[in-house]
Amino acid sequence: MGIPDDPAGSAPENFDLATMRVEYVEKDGCGDLDVDWLGDDPATGWLTLLQTWINDAWKAGLPDANAMVVGTVDADGRPVTRSVLCKSVDPDGITFYTNYDSAKGEHLAVNAYASATFPWYQLGRQVHVRGAVTKVSAEETAEYWSKRPRGSQLGAWASQQSRPIASRAALLEQLAEVTERFADLDEVPVPPNWGGYRIAPEVVEFWQGRENRVHNRIRVTGGRVERLQP
């Protein structure tokens, strides 16, 4: 599984994307998403609802319940997306950490605006966020860095993220080198080119799948909340 029988051959047997379809039904048992789920103040209610949905996904046993697809735009205006882990959700926004010299870091240096989508397919839910992006403080980065497993810290040092490399063996050799370099240190320092980005939400949209594609969509823009047609 995962490796084609013939990489240069035809598509798998009975491969028909047009007929791949799952009918959405109520999966969460909590009724239809509506504007009142955001409370009296949508400007802050989005945060509580997003935190609740992430926690629901975690309790349901979904893998990487805090994973989100982050979209950036390169210098030529071409969009790029990738999955990353959200590591903080607070009134200021949603935060993720990465190598500042990575492709997304280069994009954000040119266009400091991004989108993020949390997809929880098994629950029939999705949240989309977009807004301006800023780097978090060195102190906040250091606090999160201290919570990462040592192996993950070493991996951050070993990888020149988004840069080509000859083979996996070469990558593991780089990891071995940094492992030896920091072997005598109790704490691995934060790489100078590594840290967090925070997306300050300008728009937050909650999506809930329903039968016949008549889905529920609630959009929050500042203090304004509105239902959108699916």
UniProtKB/Swiss-Prot annotation:
Q: Where does substrate bind?
A: R21, V22, E23, Y24, K87, Y144, R148, S152, R213, V214, H215
Key words, A-Z: Flavoprotein, FMN, Oxidoreductase, Pyridoxine biosynthesis
On the tree of life, the source organism's domain of life is: Bacteria
From the UniProt record, which GO molecular function terms apply?
Answer: FMN binding; pyridoxamine phosphate oxidase activity
Question: What's the cofactor?
Answer: FMN
Keyword Transmembrane helix recorded: no
* Record-level GO BP terms: pyridoxine biosynthetic process
Give the NCBIfam families listed for this entry: pdxH (TIGR00558), PRK05679.1 (NF004231)
Describe the task this protein carries out. Answer: Catalyzes the oxidation of either pyridoxine 5'-phosphate (PNP) or pyridoxamine 5'-phosphate (PMP) into pyridoxal 5'-phosphate (PLP).
Q: Which PANTHER family match?
A: PYRIDOXINE-5'-PHOSPHATE OXIDASE, PYRIDOXINE-5-PHOSPHATE OXIDASE
Q: Can you say what this protein is called?
A: Pyridoxine/pyridoxamine 5'-phosphate oxidase
Organism, per UniProt?
A: Mycolicibacterium smegmatis (strain ATCC 700084 / mc(2)155) (Mycobacterium smegmatis)
Organismal lineage: Bacteria, Bacillati, Actinomycetota, Actinomycetes, Mycobacteriales
